[in-house]
Amino acid sequence: MIATKRSKIIPVEGLAGPEHAQILARGGQQGDIDSLTVTAVQGVAALLKFAPEIDRLNLACNRPNPFLSSAYLRCYALRSEYFQPGRGERIFLIRQGGRLIGCAPMRRSANDFAMLVGPLARLGVRLQCLAPLDTDRPGILAAPEDEERVAAALLKHLCEHERGWGMLEFVGQRPGTALHAAVHAAANRQFRARDYPAEPYTEIAVVWSSLGAYFQSLTKKMRSNVSRQARRLFAAGEVELIFAEGAAAVTAWFDVYCDLDRRSWKCGTYASIGRNPRRVRFYREIVAGGAGLDPEFVGVMLNGVLIAGLLIGSNASASPDNHGAWCLEMAYDQSLANLGPGQLLLLLAVGMAIEKSHRHLNFMQNFAYYKHRWAAEPIHVVNVQLIRCLSLHNASAYLGVAKRKLRGWRRQRAGRSRNADPTPTAANREHAAALTAAALAYDGPGVRRLGRTACRVHLPFDID
């Protein structure tokens, strides 16, 4: 059975200040060994306090998710541009007797339209994953044998005892999974469930023993396009490939990458890493190793200037027996797009994944049609929602107007300089060259530089 008694708020001992956390503790007996109880903790400090439990449950999953590690969640809560730190973080802990068997890192947030209606604002509150964006399929943490009952216990608690929300949403969920099924099973007269379309994730299963073997698995047309553009690139000047791994080595290239972002097609769009100072700080902490990911960087230089770069994160250190890599951010110089530096980056990323024995290389979301050419298979997902029938979210979901207007407003704000010209001037080139030189001056471990001769050996095609 599932125990769901009312709760009271108790401060967490030893925690104070702006990151003060609270525990919602159950009153009464927890019941016999077969009963499940759901408790909740609030605040950023709770992520630190319960870090060992969060990470233990993550490793118990079929596929450990670095975006659900305690380090990533804490970094997201403190640095993400989307939310204010210390507001709305809420971690639900599911126990069987005294044993913790499940965890759901979540947050409460108010939609913009909810702020316009005064005392009815609570009807516009959304309860969602703590880190819903810039992640891979966020959800609950539990061992495979516990997933169904943990999901059921969580949904029962949220529907019966967690007050003041209009929509419960889990983004990026595969249909048919335990969490997805539990949300739909909770639908009744008070709540309705729906699947909202979402862009698929794309992922390469790393099954090749070498970069050459992978390259040969691509279509003849794809191989021809990649090799032809690479030869054009190498004919344009002095090309050098950069491979960096580890916090210090990748950090040395971060400012160069941010400058490159301003010379890419992303300049002035919502896709730019520089669209918000908090976003820059968020990724700076990721590459510095502060988010639980092992940072990696792949770069292409032409005549002493970085013209393409890819930031990668892996979970090899946290999960040495079952690890993969995720492409986090990528950019290339738009003025040199005809040389195909972006294509070369993706090829090199697959090669690095093979070298490191990753089980998969994830390209995240968007542009699935293009990523499929690289043997990346789509992972179809939906944003599964449970909507309180008497809520602003329900009205918005039926009408669809408020959300579209708000989304368009956000895009307008983020893309005011969408027409900005990313074509570099002579001064831009000089600045880029200086930043690249500063990165090259890093003399610590973790960096490989391949000149033309080494590239002839490394690449699976003729570059001359």
For each feature predicted by the language model, list its residue ranges.
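Hydrophobic, well-ordered secondary-structure elements that form the walls
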Residues: 304, 342, 346-349, 353, ...
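Active-site/acyl-donor-binding loops of N-acyltransferases
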Residues: 2-40, 177-213, 217, 318, ...
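Conserved acetyl-CoA-binding loop-helix of GNAT-fold acetyltransferases
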Residues: 146-157, 338-350
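Hydrophobic pocket-lining residues that define ligand/cofactor binding sites across diverse proteins
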Residues: 158, 162, 290, 353
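A short, internal acetyl-CoA/4′-phosphopantetheine-binding micro-motif in the GNAT/acyltransferase core
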Residues: 135-147, 330-338
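A conserved beta-strand-loop-helix scaffold within acyl/acetyltransferase catalytic domains
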Residues: 38-123, 170-201, 209-337, 462
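Conserved GNAT acetyl-CoA-binding A-motif
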Residues: 164-172, 353-364
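ATP-hydrolysis module of ASCE/P-loop NTPase motor domains
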Residues: 148, 159-177
